[in-house]
Amino acid sequence: MATTLTPTQRYAAGALLALALRQAQIHQSVLLGAHHHHDDDDEEQGRTSTSSGGGGGSSSSSSNSGAGADADLWTHDSHGLLRPVFRFLEIDPKAWSGLEETAASSEAKHHIGAFLRIIFEEDGESSSDRSVQELALAKGVDVMVMSLGNDSEVGNTIKGGDQDALPSSSGTDKSPGESSHDDQLGINKLTLDDIPANNHRKMALLFALLSACVADKPVSQEEEDRKSTRFRKGYDARHRVALRLLSTWLDVKWIKMEAIEVMVACSAMAAAKEQEQSQESASPKSKWEKWKRGGIIGAAALTGGALLAITGGLAAPAIAAGFGALAPTLGTLVPVIGASGFAAMATAAGSVAGSVAVAASFGAAGAGLTGSKMARRIGSVKEFEFKPIGENHNQGRLAVGILISGFAFDEDDFCRPWEGWQDNLERYILQWESKHIIAVSTAIQDWLTSRLAMELMKQGAMRTVLSGLLAAFAWPATLLAATDFIDSKWSVAIDRSDKAGKMLAEVLLKGLQGNRPVTLIGFSLGARVIFKCLQELALSSDNEGLVERVVLLGAPVSVKGERWEAARKMVAGRFVNVYSTDDWILGVTFRASLLTQGLAGIQAIDVPGVENVDVTELVDGHSSYLSAAQQILEHLELNTYYPVFVPLSAANEETDGTVAQ
């Protein structure tokens, strides 16, 4: 395999991915950082709770490797997440089962340090050549980070960086609380100080692992038969979560991993375009050899050749400038290309921007969400349309964000709340049943401006009404009468949201997102659409790899009587429930559920693996989410692996204090 990693290091790389996969699955049901003691007990709980029955013993994987309980583990062969990676890394097949058992054992975290030390070992042979190649790759990552450039912190990092690579000492920007995040990440036997400050080797490791995760790998006939019904091509959300955790172990900022994703996507597209142009009728084996040789981390990529090809699918001015700035350094390190060659290619990149349709990454075929016709109509849903938002389209992004409003006064409100949020996802908004959403939102607004509502607000009755609801007190008759005309519109909107959720699930199952991990974020009825989508995905097996993260804001979803655990299992990474105890409008409109079953948008929910974030300080009414969504998302720090435990009020006080100084 064309990589700078030795066979032993490739073995360690596969082991680290396996360990990260297992730890990430544990964190689905044991909220990371929620317990600072009895880590081993937590890990064993995570091991058993992921099985469908929730029960089971504490026997190790080595003595129970064939049991049905182990089939639920992401590291099990039935999920197809590890063995294709092992094959790509050319790890001896005799070692595969041992790696899987090590990852599944309750002592897995104690192996992490040993495997990391192997990764950073130098064997003395050709170490100079390897260092040059790894440095070239790290430089390529730096260039890509600059082109992503929507993060002010990245700019500060570049200004303060050393000559070799952007510093990555703050990969976990801030830990949740004063305790070391090592304990919370399952590496309590290892401190980050034990990891060598070899940024170049870290980039080579992450590049190799990502390449292995997304490559279309040849398999045996038996595996091919099973893959056709069970495995999906593309980038599995569970792989991305595991790489996010591994990046945290390595203290690598996530934007660097995003840069590597773009590089791999563009390299793959360049290889595909070259293959298409040559019109070769190559055998699967020769295609595989070509992919390994040139499509990923081959010599061309590591010496800069393929890195230049990447510019074809990017917004060229920024990245061309980056190549121009780095040309002298890279030219010295890679005489084959030369400084003038880099400068010339950087200039050329500015004139051919967008010539490579990298939006077709892994099956999106250019059209993707926006180019597809509406999914099969369900019930009476008349409108269900994806619209691109932001500047990250046709940029080789390997992750997608779908943003869903559920409270709107005009069509712009389906887009406006999400415009200011800066992220490197390829983002889309879902505009659905706008007629009904606007109707119910307007009805609520009209009621708020009525004489009765104004009088009640003047008397401070609204918050006491909500308190009364939670205590199951009787409602004032005047208030009930005033909300009658809202109820019918709300009932219709609830019905449409449930059906839209099923349609969203169908879109994801069809792979219209390009077989890339999806982040789902929605507020109000949009949050309900997402929840119902997850429930629909949970009805059939093997759908755990589609959705990476979920954020529900002000969700009109009952706490009891809904399959929260099943929905949680469909999300590989973080699942956040954002609520406001002062959202009395949600309580009024969904009062029947609130009285008997609780309501996620108003209170914390006790579901293993779900983060609860109280935003009462920002949201004093349901419509507040329209203006507060961006600030809430920034507070959640979704690109960190661990949950955010700092209350919003405390975070604001800290910010105010910093400004005051």
Swiss-Prot record:
The chain crosses the membrane at residues 306-326, 333-353, 355-375, 466-486. GO terms for molecular function: carboxylic ester hydrolase activity. GO terms for cellular component: endoplasmic reticulum membrane; membrane. Keywords: Endoplasmic reticulum, Hydrolase, Membrane, Transmembrane, Transmembrane helix. The keyword Transmembrane applies. Residues 34-71, 154-185 are annotated as: Disordered. One of its GO terms (biological process) is pollen wall assembly. Disruption phenotype: Male sterility due to delayed tapetum degradation and aborted pollen wall formation. Reduced amount of total monogalactosyldiacylglycerol (MGDG) and digalactosyldiacylglycerol (DGDG) in anthers. Residues 175-184 have a biased composition (Basic and acidic residues). Its main location: endoplasmic reticulum. Belongs to the TMCO4 family. Involved in anther lipids biosynthesis and is required for tapetum degradation and pollen wall formation. Required for the formation of Ubisch bodies and microspores. Possesses lipase activity in vitro toward two synthetic substrates, p-nitrophenyl acetate (pNPA) and p-nitrophenyl butyrate (pNPB). PANTHER family: TRANSMEMBRANE AND COILED-COIL DOMAIN-CONTAINING PROTEIN 4, TRANSMEMBRANE AND COILED-COIL DOMAIN-CONTAINING PROTEIN 4 TMCO4. This is Transmembrane and coiled-coil domain-containing protein STS1. It comes from Oryza sativa subsp. japonica (Rice).
